[in-house]
């Protein structure tokens, strides 16, 4: 660079027209501008390198989060599959419970039929008992009637017995009188005959009374047997009624238990349906989150790719322009060196021409040739300067574009950060869903345990019903 400045200084001193000095001035200013831009580009490249490092760090963090989310999603899918299998098992158990309930319902129907049969038996026994009560009432009426008759006959018999005793006393008295009263013997015989007739009548009446009392005794025996039979039937009825009441109580208790079990099973089924709906909802949310994560990752990748591609392209273009500028500067420096040498040669020839009188034409031709070559080199240098200006203009445009890309990349970086925050929110939401799924799994397990307990109770109830049927 110092050599170039020295050459340009010599040209400015030696140039008569001052044109070379102006060209040097422009080239020097442009060189300063180029150096300033190069320093700015280096500074920007350092910033871009730092930004790229930050982007790589964020990408690694994002990949780590995505890998963790993918593991969580795989684990969630396994849990969902497990829940679906448990749900299918619950549906199968529910179907088995329905079959068991159907069987219990059939057994309950049989128990009801048996109860109806026993109720018919009870009605029949009650009918027989009512008939017996009616018969007993009729016989009680007969008994009362016959008791009244017996009492009347007994009273009459007692009267006759008293009368018989009186007659015997009279006979004794008459016998005494007979012994004492011989005079009235015939009369007494008549009286005795009359008394004997009365006595015979009394004996006949007593026999008739005894004959009348015989069916009453038979009726009393039948009545006693009827009382015993009625007591036995009443006892049998009470036993049957107690058995029916016991079976009705057991049946009613079993019906209540079955009703409660059915209600609990329906409640568990409702809870299972709710769990199934929650699982479907969780699955849908997970699919939505997966879709959002995929879209976000695609958008982040696209932004990073665009950011990298635009930056690399502009940097590449700037590098190419820098290389072209360097090449042109090298060529321009070489041309300027040649111009300096050529001007020295021209000055030398001018001195020779001024001091020498010989070979003037030859020196003139040589000077013309050198001047033509000098003009050609000056035009070439100007062409290099024009090309450098054009390249610098392009580089300035590219620098502006680079600044715009850096600004856009900053915006894209902010957008990437927002998307990463969104990914973090989605990850937390996935974690919450996983916790909810764990709670739901626990709830399903608890429902399974409850259903298992209900199945055991139904089995036990079925055994009790079978034993009652026997």
UniProtKB/Swiss-Prot annotation:
Keywords: Signal
Record-linked InterPro entries: Mplasa_alph_rch
Signal peptide: 1-24
UniProt name for this protein: Uncharacterized protein MCAP_0864
Originating organism: Mycoplasma capricolum subsp. capricolum (strain California kid / ATCC 27343 / NCTC 10154)
